[in-house]
Amino acid sequence: MADVAIRIPKERRPRDATRAASRTAILDAARRVAARTGARELSLRGVAAEAGFAPAALYGYFRNKDELLLALAADDLTALARVMRDAGGLAGAGIAALDLLKGAETMAAASGAFAAGQGGDAERLFNGRLIAALKALSDASGLPTGSRAHQCDVVLLASALAGLALFARSGRLGALGFTPDEMIARLDSRFRG
């Protein structure tokens, strides 16, 4: 009887590992398709073809395009938290965040998933990673988070960075005569002063 109890987890591990590898392959394929066509134009059928899966197979991993976009954006948030933690200081974290966000169209594309209000695991994963990214920004910038007002400051700073990324990505920042470095320096002085 004990032998059976030991074998069951061993049988599950390869299946779980295979499922995780398949999910990773789907996300990698989705990122390639998004790079070619834009995240907003992403389709489950196109991702399935890129990943070498039957289109229906993707529904075992993601209920719809919104969930797939949320998963991509959650991965981008993990990368964002990492670069901000490694950058040191508000100016360094801001520049690193802006560089990453300029190329992360998935965040903007995923915003439509929130409007649909479907919730679920994908949204919970995104929210958890968003909190981790906000914490990394707070830590890197030295901003405290002990009060509601301080937490608002961190969210305002993150919102400013997201807006700057949108302006930079669309070419509007340069068209207005500003550089990312100049804007980050101004943010740094406003939040430090």
Task: Describe every region a protein language model picked out.
Residues 1-21, 170:
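N-terminal intrinsically disordered/low-complexity leader segments
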Residues 19, 69, 73, 77, ...:
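Amphipathic, non-transmembrane alpha-helical scaffold segments
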Residues 22, 26-34, 76, 80, ...:
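Short hydrophobic clusters on alpha-helical segments that form packing/core surfaces
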Residues 25, 29, 33-67, 71:
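Helix-turn-helix
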Residues 25, 67, 92-96, 152-160, ...:
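Amphipathic alpha-helical interaction segments
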Residues 43, 108-113, 173-177:
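Short, hydrophobic secondary-structure boundary micro-motifs
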Residues 71, 82-110, 124-129, 147:
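Hydrophobic alpha-helical connector segments
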Residues 116-159, 177-192:
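Amphipathic alpha-helical packing segments from all-alpha helical-bundle domains
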